[in-house]
Amino acid sequence: MSTAGSGSARILPDGDDARAEAIALLRAGAIVAIPTDTVYGIAADLALPDAIERLFAAKRRPPDKAVALLLADADQAGVLGIVGPAARVLAARFWPGGMTLVLPRRPDARLPDVLAAGAPTVGLRVPDHPAPRALAAELGPLPTTSANLSGQPDARDAAEIAALLGGAVALVIDGGPIRGGPASTVVDCTVERPVVRRVGAIPPARIAEALDAAGIAHDIEGS
């Protein structure tokens, strides 16, 4: 059963029907809000540049702020990024889960520059939630950013997202209230010695331990 308010997005409970509708809407260029294992996100189809522009506009995100892509599985990372030894170790250890890996962008990757704020890099994550993975399995890597206005607190549930983002979002997949945890930890693997750019769901000490165990040098505190 769906609900809607004046100027608000439709809300459908997470499940096969909601995911099928989300896929159709994304292919048509709409913006959809989805649950993840960290916070709710809003997503667009990577193949549609106009939709990506609407993604930035929906949350008033400045163009100098990069947007990561959610993946169905670790295999999709190699489509857009160059997966080096450190990234391979971290993906095997922490995906699916709350870690975004920043990788060098593949020269042949079809990726709008705005998603990386003009840098030759790409941020990728496999979330520990079936809804975004199902969408990415069907559509490919999914540009996704947190479902809030830029610089504001994260929306806590589907109704709040629908009210906050209004007509900018066509559908909200309702996965229940968020757990209130942090966003993903961001690890930069484009430098010689990986470094944490944002502390989040996965503590730096655990990341350092994984790299130490693999014999990979890094600049992450906690080892």
Where are these regions (language model features)?
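Active-site-adjacent structural elements in enzyme catalytic cores
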Residues: 1-223
